[in-house]
Amino acid sequence: YQVAKPAKVISFNSPKIKVLFAGQYNLYMQQDADMLIDCLIKSKDLSELKEHYVYTFLGKGWDNHVERLNKAGYETHHIKFAPDYIEEICKHDIQVTPICIGTGTKGKVLDAIANGLLVVGSWYALENIAVEHNVSCIQYEEIKDVVNILKKIHLNPSKYEAIAECGRENILQKHNGETTSKELFCLFK
């Protein structure tokens, strides 16, 4: 992972909380991303989700999702490529990661957490990462749960800012390449 210098200030206090979907729309996210967009559009509390959030999709293949959310009245943006990926993700508060297939540790998830974003993800998105639900990340069981999670976040932003900070500290400490290398090479002494 890469970390921005200076470190991002974790604060969900701008006019709207900025939600990021990062990575290509592909096999790993297709099923759950499609279901999440349907849930957002069909939500009974649509105005609440529109009023408090802006949604950005970073990566290729999200055109249909952006168009559908825009038609439903959401403030939605699409960035197909960011020349400085870390700088771009640091402009956001939350990263939703609807990965539905296990593939090991996710670099984009590590980047997000290490840079102070609150990651809301599936078990697959968070596998092999030193985080804990409701302590250093938010892990959902079913994709439809993300709608209720978003409703809770805007009602108590300081709680979720603290979770994001704990996540950042965990990643910087437990996924530190230099420390891990030293520990590994100590095994061979």
Located regions from the model:
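Conserved acidic donor-binding segment of nucleotide-sugar-dependent glycosyltransferases
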Residues: 136-144, 152-157
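Short acidic/histidine- and often glycine-rich active-site loop of Leloir-type glycosyltransferases
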Residues: 123-134, 138-139
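Conserved catalytic-core segment of nucleotide-activated headgroup transferases in glycan assembly
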Residues: 1-72, 78-85, 89-90
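Acidic donor-binding loop of glycosyltransferase active sites
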Residues: 90-104, 115-117
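A charged, aromatic-enriched C-terminal amphipathic alpha-helix characteristic of glycosyltransferases
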Residues: 158-188
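Residue-level signal for the nucleotide or nucleotide-sugar donor/cofactor binding architecture
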Residues: 31, 107, 141-142, 175
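Short glycine/proline-enriched, acidic/aromatic patches that form the donor-sugar handling elements
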Residues: 64, 85-86, 102-105, 125-130
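Short hydrophobic beta-strand element within catalytic cores of glycosyltransferases
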Residues: 108-111, 118-122
